[in-house]
Amino acid sequence: MRFLQVYKSSALIGLIILLASKVNLAEAKRKLVATSLVTCMENSQLSANSFDVVFNPDDRSLHYDLDMSTQIDSYIFADIDVYAYGFKIITKNVDLCSINWKQFCPVHPGNIQIDSIEYISSEYVNEIPGIAYQVPDIDAYARVKITNNVSEYLACIQIYFSNGKTVSQIGVKWATAVVAGIGLLLSAILSTFGNSTAASHISANTMSLFLYFQSVVVVAMQHVHRVPPIAAAWAENLVWSMGLIRISFMQRIFRWYVQSTGGTPSLYLTSTSMSVLAQRSWQYLMELPLIKRATNVLYGNANTLIFRGIKRLGYKMGIENTSIVCTGFTFFVLCGYVLAGFIIVFKCCVELATRLGWIQKARFWEFRKQWRMILKGALLRYIYIGFVQLTILSFWEFTERDSPAVIVIACLFILLSCGLMLWAAWRTVFFARRSVALYNNPAALLYGDEYVLHKYGFFYTMFNANHYWWNIVLLSYIFVKSLLVGFAQASGQTQVLFMFILDLFYFVAIIYYKPYLDRPTNIMNILIATVTVVNSFLFMFFSDLFNQSYKVAAIMGWIFFIMNAAFSFILLMMILAFAGMMLFSKNPDLRFKPAKDDRTSFQRNTMKPEGTVNRSVANELLALGNVAKDHDDNSDYESNDTGVNDELKQAQDETTPTTVTSSDDNKPTFSEKILSKFSRPKNENASTDALRVEAPKQQTFPHNLTNLSRENLSTLGSKPYPGHTRSQSDAHNGLINSFEEEDTSSNTDPFHDSTEGDLLDTSSSDGGFRSQNYVRDDSINSLGNNKQPLRKPPGFFDEGFM
């Protein structure tokens, strides 16, 4: 009798699945799965300890593994309602006695345990519509209300179905991760080669892409009532950006670590006695058999767990609740070691290739000399990328308390991330204010000092020089969001309301200030902020904040998926386009418009080894030396006019060693020397007479041409450009307005004070600047006539230096 009761009970469940399958879909094998049965009323007299049902429409087989308990002792009737995306599509009233299910006519109290297979009639199988097999992550469920013969409400159960088709795909996860990684790798490589404009653009766009991916995951971590399956599945594609990646052996290590450090690891993924619905987080009191899960919808017990928020994401990724924090922290540390190891190995390879003569000595010179500073800057940039991940997981660990050791690690990561970002922000503001005090432009030191640029450039190169401080606003915005997600998991409605307000304020601020380095980058980040605000608005419906019908939330779930999938595709294609332009372009800087903040005017060119001369300068000096040698050979004809020839001969004697050591390619060949001998004019006296006449009109050459600075070379014999007018600076900083005054004034290098020597001294305690003489690009000539006298920078600890 007990067996027949269980058998008929399973048949009832099979009927419910078939009714719901009218709006469901199957994968290629056309499989329908139901793994969770939850109660939808308090004190329900029918509940499930474990529930696993699989229906195969090809052979009409229904495999079920049930462990249920009931307290009903009467004749019962079932009111079955099937919902698709919140719309009721099927309603059926079933008298269990009329369908000859004797074990339900009447039902007696007890446990129901069965594992069996039943074949369903083709009448029900043929009712499944064809469109049901084409939609991924379909949102369908069945609600069964059980009453007795006097219409007394006895029990309510709700069953959620899955079809095996989903938009959460391994290929999508790898594609998004690889493209974002390519963007960061290219920006790092271009920075090493000195292509600053291209590197700044690709770095800014890739960082914005990372922050957008993380924002999608953050909004999906909110403790809302129920996330539509299509929206939850898309968020799973981007969970890798938060370090939540499942590796089986690592999960075993984390479980052992939590247990060995005083915690109790969870085993929900391997448990065979529990049913899990990945929608809501699990809380229940051990002394109560049934606990309310929401205001008016679902309930669970000690054997039926309902996850949502961070736990839901972890469960969907195959990570135990007590291993979520350990997983995120571990992948962050491992990726950091890989980054540092890559830079160190690359440096060793470059040094080895240089010593073996495989590459020229001038190649990667800046990287070889400042690789330690580049390594520090790369690690700071990496911590900046992982700031969202570290703060959210650390704050959430304080509420979960997996084990004392994990709590200590969370404290250390909070101090690490927040401390380093505060230090980078403070140093950036310090250097910018000192630059404004000295040169009336924050870009002078932020981009002119290689020490500052390599170490703290990640903090401000994405933004216009006048908005160097914007990352402080961005990090504060991220920090507040982390507080909401980490500490407010107990109240999803509180989270979504404050999250929407916060996103809205940031959206208005970024439109008002437009802080990024150029217009296209500003437009892209404004669009990202727009999508983020819309996502926050949609999750307000998922939290039942407005008490609307679930059909509204289901439609919003599809809007969330379509909008974010399309926008992610556009961003990924843009990064790939940038990568293609850089890989197939000889000069990637020409592909991008320079930022309108004069940063290129202050950035130094790629450093050269000591004792070498730029190729163009060496060619000019070689040509000047050849002319001087020709005149020296004709000195017998010009004995009365030695002024100019002495100057040129001295220039040749001083130039020849430097030219030879700087570039062997510039040395004249033997055939060129022979041709130069036979190419002299026949009337040599006439040529020397002409030279004698023109000599007084020429400028007096300095005695040491090789020691000429770039400024002296550029002004030697310079003439004003006819008809040339300078336009106003787009940055409105007043640096270009005094171009005419520069032509008549003395050539003063604003970055070098002969009375003070080096501008900055890293060995001193006055701010940690690097000792160097700044060289400014004279082709831009945008600084203007600095009327203010240079003064010694205040000390690092001097009063009032900020």
Curated annotation (Swiss-Prot):
Which regions are flagged for Polar residues bias?
653-663, 697-717, 761-788
Topological domain (Lumenal) residues are 29-169, 222-229, 279-323, 399-405, 489-495, 547-557
One cellular component (GO) term of this entry: endoplasmic reticulum membrane
Q: Which residues lie on this side of the membrane: Cytoplasmic?
A: 191-200, 251-255, 345-377, 427-467, 517-525, 579-802
Point out the signal peptide segment: 1-28
Q: Does the keyword Ribonucleoprotein apply?
A: no
Q: Which GO terms describe its molecular function?
A: FAD transmembrane transporter activity
Q: Name one Pfam family in it.
A: TRP_N
Locations listed in the record: Endoplasmic reticulum membrane
Which family does the entry's similarity section mention?
Belongs to the transient receptor potential (TRP) ion channel family.
Name the record gives this protein:
Putative flavin carrier protein 3
The species this protein was found in: Saccharomyces cerevisiae (strain ATCC 204508 / S288c) (Baker's yeast)
Source organism phylogeny: Eukaryota, Fungi, Dikarya, Ascomycota, Saccharomycotina
